[in-house]
Design a protein with these regions (language model features):
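Anion-recognition interface
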Residues: 1-373
Length: 373
């Protein structure tokens, strides 16, 4: 029977690197019986390489704004193309991290279940998990960095209290997915670079779908999604609160702060939680994590490192944040000065042309003749 390989993230586990790998190695995948479709429809802020996004549709829309008829039409068109691919290939690969947080909220799994009932293909779900505190911080960091959302101004404390759409009960979510596809059809991998097959997420994913990488495969050396340092993240969060902030300025702020974050200095020695806070936060998930290790990772005694060691808790206003703030505003000032100089030069040139109209016309005639020759 044909196999649909569905990679569902979770978010913040190098999903883009996996998707680019599948896209860039389409020809080699095809030779080994796999196909990675790239569909023609586009969703806001979603790369086309996220080819399973049709299962959840536009996640930015509220329930009232959604068009179920349009979503169903796209779903049927997508599966029409998938069934055509199955005529030539034994395996079709789909990938989108939104299925983890939104799959049940927006009926993606229910739609998939109906297709499975047709008994045309079997399914293998691949999911990467990272420790809940690390996942939450990485998620918050990304939301703040992107900006332009209500949640982009959340403090760390607010994020922990509200956790919008984030599914941290890994075991509970896996059990719901298992009810649709069967537990035996779920492959759980730890998002831990030290444990990846071949020391690379691409090689590890290939192993998860039954492939062994050969020398011909391309792995993009730089699929960068730079996380802001904790200090730069706090600066960006405060900037997100500015009234009248538009996309152009938001992108500019993000660019500068991402540049600063490329030199993280001692950022890694800080944690957003103290050791007691970390233990309390993780205590909610320890039993579920233990059961995942027992039921999905046969032979492993635990899912994540549970030593919970913390060097220092990060606090706003520390010396690194002061340095980042000074650097950021220095970069903005230099950029404005440079732009001002360019405008002054343009104004000077324009004034000269206005004061010497005949010379300006003569120069244009000379230039046009040179071009004609």
């Amino acid at each position: 029977m044909k196999t649909l390989y569905l990679h569902i993230g979770t978010p913040k586990t190098a999903t883009t690197a996996i998707q680019f790998f599948c896209r860039d190695n389409q020809e080699l995948l095809n030779r080994q019986g796999y196909f990675y479709p790239v569909f023609e429809w586009k969703y806001p802020n979603v790369l086309r390489t996220r080819n399973a996004h049709f299962l959840v549709g536009d996640t930015y829309l509220s329930q009232e704004e959604r068009s179920l008829e349009e979503e169903e039409k796209v779903f049927q068109e997508a599966f029409g193309q998938i069934y055509e691919a199955f005529e030539q290939y034994d395996g079709v690969i789909l990938s989108d991290e939104s299925m983890w947080n939104h799959g049940f909220r927006i009926d993606g799994w229910n739609r998939l279940k109906k297709e499975l009932e047709r008994n045309i293909f079997t399914i293998k779900v691949i999911v990467y998990l990272r420790r809940q505190d690390e996942f939450t911080y990485s998620w918050w960091n990304q939301v703040v960095k992107e900006g332009m959302k209500k949640t982009s101004s959340f403090t760390w404390k607010e994020m922990l209290e509200k956790l919008p759409v984030v599914q941290l009960d890994y075991y509970g979510t896996l059990e719901k997915i298992a009810a649709v596809v069967g537990k035996e059809n779920i492959t759980v991998r730890k998002f831990d670079r030290a444990s990846f097959v071949g020391q690379a997420i691409q090689a590890d994913f290939a192993d998860a779908i039954g492939l062994e990488l050969s020398e011909g495969y391309q792995i993009e050396s730089k699929v960068e999604n730079i996380s802001l340092t904790k200090s730069s993240n706090e600066i960006k969060r405060l900037l997100n609160c500015l009234p009248g902030l538009d996309k152009k300025r938001n992108d500019l702020f993000r660019e500068y702060l991402s540049g600063i974050s490329m030199n993280p200095r001692n950022d890694r020695q800080y944690s957003m939680l103290s050791e007691p806070e970390l233990r309390e936060f993780m205590s909610k998930y320890e039993e579920g994590n233990r059961r995942i290790a027992e039921e999905y990772l046969k032979g492993q005694d635990k899912l994540f490192d549970d030593s919970y060691q913390v060097e220092k808790k990060w606090e706003s206003g520390n010396s690194l944040m002061v340095e980042d703030a000074v650097t950021f505003f220095g970069m903005v000032t230099l950029s404005l000065l440079k732009k001002n100089e360019e405008l002054e030069h343009q104004i000077t040139t324009l004034r000269y042309k206005l004061n010497h109209p005949f010379q300006t016309v003569g120069n244009r005639i000379k230039n046009s003749r040179k071009k004609a020759q």
